[in-house]
């Protein structure tokens, strides 16, 4: 076959396969058999392999998955991916309608209602009609680049029907039938199954190997335009129509409503129809349709005033409580957990539910053998709502909390003003294991690849008992563990080695000193600069620090007044673990050349590691100015958790937005 003929045939096959994909995955109306589709795809793959000069980034063959990635790169969203306020009942919907009408002086308002897909929110960027990048929502400001995995989803067009530059947003999901098939395969292979389709979709789309994502048969509904060049669309419903014309898959079950009564009827209708869909939904999204009215209504500190998400009521089911299991946390708190006959709740098989503490068991008169009502709090955490007393037979057993720790047999105590029972044995194995999990966590030593499963393996193999033991681990030891190969063992040893360079505040937080969170750990690290100086500090010296109270000061002094702790710190020194503060102190900032010099910065939302007052002081010490509102003169918005209206203002004025992690990186340069 000549090059000219090969090129022509490749183009024909691409057009043909793109048409087949659109008919099957967007229109849900296939025109050919799977066998015919596969024959054409294999012919295309063969021709492209023989003629690599004709390979294209938007070829349908890309969808089978490409090169394995090492990491997901971070992506800052051009405009923040904000969350919506919630409605839980008819009254909440009517309140929303009242607020909307008041905000626009009772002008005529039309709503558009859409199914709230229970999947993974993603953004899709197109340049002149070509798909160039896709990202997860992340924290709303910064997500992860998952472009290669999104290319495997056949409902996402690689090239649009117009050469337009835009950003579309939507929800990637796994159809129920694909979820069932995937879990059946996992069970046959002896692997852990996914709890629900949402977890399966999220787990699939974040695979470093795109070939795995390609096999998972994911799909996607696009629900909005975030940015589109040189085009004004007057309503949300028209933007959805436009997205459909471009080749995107939009949900066909949307409806425009003239009154709140019509909205409520739509909600009730889909609450009934919900089980018959081939994908999970967890509510209804209601938006003011007119874009001009949306802009007039604006946003609150947390969410837009022109939209709300109605959340379906938490599903409640009845099952039998077969036992009560106890767990011991890193601080020694003993927590009871109900063991249940397996039951499906909100799309997940539930076998356990929280009982919180002994007082709750007494208050609800929960007994082993009872039939109980179980629901998911916020559709996330299973909990026992109440006992069905009419089903009691007399054979149920009252439950009494033990007097001794289930992990180490030490006597349990109830500290003053505390509801929970606590094990105060510092050598309790359960506390040690949980403490190790905390030590390696993200806000502590942040050791990549070392999570709960691996810590448990290492602990059970008796390789680790103290934090310092982590730094003596060898590749040979790791290779003895299940699921560890040469590469993963080498990577973990290197990650542990890298953690030695962390700044003091991470180590302090990782130690798990009672009452000392990430923010307090940073305060101590910046104030004392070295671990040795903090160890020698008195209670009075600690209390003299701004925002450090008596309880925390006493806890820190008591922690370091312990020979085992001092021995641990000595081991850290011998292993080369850094125990000094590497950040910049406010007193030293005046002499530093900084990005912030001359910049106007706005802080919004909750900053976890560094409080807003401390962040303000540091920015000002670096020559920046912190203001309370976003305007055209603002250079940067730093957004923490629950950031709201200021993000919308940043988008309006085209102001750069950083999350806290990016902000801290710049401060510590």
Swiss-Prot record:
Catalytic residues identified in the record: 116
Keyword presence, Cell inner membrane: no
An example molecular function term from Gene Ontology annotations: metal ion binding
Any one of the GO CC terms: cytosol
Binding site for NAD(+): 34-38, 83-84, 114, 137, 171, 287, 311
Keywords: DNA damage, DNA repair, DNA replication, Ligase, Magnesium, Manganese, Metal-binding, NAD, Zinc
Cofactor(s) essential for the protein: Mg(2+); Mn(2+)
Catalyses which reaction(s): NAD(+) + (deoxyribonucleotide)n-3'-hydroxyl + 5'-phospho-(deoxyribonucleotide)m = (deoxyribonucleotide)n+m + AMP + beta-nicotinamide D-nucleotide
CDD domains given in the database record: BRCT_DNA_ligase_like, LIGANc
Positions bound to Zn(2+): 405, 408, 423, 428
Domain of life from the UniProt record: Bacteria
EC number: 6.5.1.2
UniProt record similarity statement: Belongs to the NAD-dependent DNA ligase family. LigA subfamily.
Free-text function comment from the UniProt entry: DNA ligase that catalyzes the formation of phosphodiester linkages between 5'-phosphoryl and 3'-hydroxyl groups in double-stranded DNA using NAD as a coenzyme and as the energy source for the reaction. It is essential for DNA replication and repair of damaged DNA.
Protein name, entry field: DNA ligase
Biological source species: Bacillus anthracis
Top-level taxonomy: Bacteria, Bacillati, Bacillota, Bacilli, Bacillales
